[in-house]
Amino acid sequence: MAEALAPSSSANLGPGFDSVALALEITCRVVAEPAAEWSVTHHGPHSPAPGDDDAVLRAARTAVGDDNPLALEVFNEIPRGRGLGSSAAAFVAGAAAASRAVLGESDPERVFRLAVDLEGHGDNVGAAVFGGLVAVVGNVVRPLQLHEELRVVVAVPSRRLPTQWARHARPEVIEHEAAARSVARAIALIEAFRSGDLQLFAAAAGDELHEAPRGALFPESDDLMFTARSAGALHACWSGAGPSILAVTGPSEADAVAAALVGALDDQVVVLMPEIATTGLR
């Protein structure tokens, strides 16, 4: 028997579209054991609906082949369809647990490449495998420095926003000026996470490439970001494709930001205060 655990993640973080992600200590754990035939059992409230694609099973079969059947058990804490990297964590944990059960080990680079192929983009996968704050370009992933005093608060609306809907909301053509502003904001964001600089976090706000178009689909997310900033957050952004939002705070502001978000959206929101997952796949 073998097991693997992967953290959730918040991707994009505003201007870092499909290239930056932060790992969070909300986890997906998979236990794998050789069996006569393939099976998967899910525990907890965040299980795929009957008929939905099972990311853990697909990753496990891809990692070790159909001829090495496993009985899989999944213990998932990550809300699905809320922009918290649930599919990336499932792919990573499923591939790693299967590899450990059949091959005796799981190479992080192999798991990363396999999960990127399944996921289609590498930001959430990079955070799930390597932890912390990461930058991802294609199959190249590198850790970024993270100021030790930063804290995060996550607001999860009760209503889902399927990732494919959010992706279709993006404009097909981006004006040169908007693209240039986005690059500048991304640079400011990365340095803000390293230094904790308040002015740089402020400069990184206001993404035009994906947050603004998606706001029309789910304006409640924009309301949550406004609430977080008004309560003292250094930075607030869509978490991945949403509708969850991530608020970045200092240590003394986290409780106030969380309290403000708890009362938002007529209480149709769950507020989490996870630790940043400095370690990824384990």
Residue ranges of each PLM-predicted region?
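Short beta-strand-to-loop capping motifs
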Residues: P34, P157, A247-P251
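Alpha/beta catalytic cores of group-transfer enzymes, especially the acyltransferase/condensing modules
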Residues: S106-L150, A236-W238, G242-L246
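Phosphate-handling active-site elements
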Residues: A35-E37, G65-A71, A98-L114, V140, ...
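Glycine-rich beta-alpha junction loops
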Residues: I26, A36, G132, V156-L161, ...
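Glycine-rich, charge-dense phosphate/pyrophosphate-binding loop(s)
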Residues: F193-R282
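ATP-binding N-lobe of GHMP and related small-molecule kinases
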Residues: M1-R82, G104, P108, L272-R282
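DPxDG-like acidic metal-binding loop motif
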Residues: L24-I26, L84-P108, V129-G131
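Active-site rim beta-loop-alpha module in soluble metabolic enzymes
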Residues: V156-A216
